[in-house]
A protein has these predicted regions:
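Carboxylate/His-rich catalytic cores and anion/metal-binding grooves
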Residues: 1-23
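Secretory-pathway/luminal and periplasmic proteins that interact with or process carbohydrate-rich
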Residues: 5-12, 81-90, 105-106, 152-157, ...
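Acidic/histidine-rich catalytic neighborhood
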Residues: 77-131
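Alpha-helical transition-metal enzyme core signature, strongest for iron centers
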Residues: 3, 75-82, 228
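Beta-strand segments within the central parallel beta-sheet cores of soluble alpha/beta enzyme folds
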Residues: 67-76, 93-99, 140, 201
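Carbohydrate-binding/catalytic loop surfaces
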Residues: 15-38, 93-113, 161-173, 228-229
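Active-site core of glycosidic bond-cleaving carbohydrate-active enzymes
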Residues: 1-8, 32-35, 39-64, 69, ...
């Protein structure tokens, strides 16, 4: 895939973004293409988001050769990027510093968008290590950092999944982005099958966004309502 090609290209533009921050691995901005182009505003957690697609390809195909040769090398160096970037907060949890909820609100440490995506990256990379029977120094470090990683799931004052750590979410804010619900969709940390509290909090947050939006945002909301087992609202 072009993601593996560009992420692993020595001295490529995606690696250069990471090197500017003194990090291993790679990172991208908001706009990217198959030729390695990346521009506009920084979107660091997008590298973790890309990796979810690599893992999902394996999960649906069970192609172990693909996992070993294509997905694993990218997932590994992406984790190393976050090893270098994460910081410890006052509670001893690892958080992504100076991140944002795309097109919405302030820049803060530990924003839900970043935390949920990095959590998915670490969790799925550990799953990949299990499939491939990899147990080395990298996996040991990954396990240690994953155990201290903030998962980005915090319930706010009006029962919602919080979008930021410090900034207070505004009820009835109809922002089209649902970046604080990455753990609901496309990731799967939030589910009625896993923890009803978080599923209910995601429902409160999603309902607060309203149903009106641009086309892509409506499609996203359909997927989120489906994940919450509400076929009528999705329809």
């Amino acid at each position: 895939t072009y993601v593996s090609t560009e992420a692993l290209k020595d001295g490529g533009s995606w690696q250069q973004v990471a090197r500017k921050e003194n990090c291993r691995g790679w990172a991208v901005h908001t706009q990217n293409n198959i030729f390695g182009y990346t521009d506009w505003l920084i979107n660091r957690p997008a590298n973790a988001w890309y990796c979810t697609h690599l893992w999902q390809h394996y999960a649906y195909t069970l192609d172990k050769e693909y996992l070993r040769d294509t997905a694993w090398p990218v997932m590994k160096v992406t984790c190393q990027y976050w090893f270098d970037r994460l910081k410890e907060n006052t509670e001893g949890r690892l958080v992504a510093p100076n991140e944002w909820s795309p097109e919405h609100g302030p820049w803060e440490d530990g924003v839900a968008y970043a935390q949920q995506l990095v959590y998915a990256l670490f969790e799925e990379t550990l799953a990949a290590a299990g499939v491939l029977a990899v147990d080395d120094a990298f996996v040991s470090e990954l396990k240690e950092k994953f155990s201290r990683l903030d998962n980005g799931l915090h319930i706010g004052s009006w029962g919602q999944i919080k979008e930021w750590t410090i900034q207070e979410d505004k009820q009835g804010d109809h922002q089209r982005h649902l970046s604080h619900l990455m753990a609901l969709y496309p990731c799967d940390q939030i589910s009625y099958l896993k923890d009803k509290r978080y599923a209910e909090a995601a429902k409160v947050a999603l309902d607060s966004r309203g149903d009106g939006a641009t086309g892509w945002s409506r499609a996203w909301k359909v997927a989120c309502w489906a994940r919450l087992w509400d076929g009528e609202r999705a329809y």
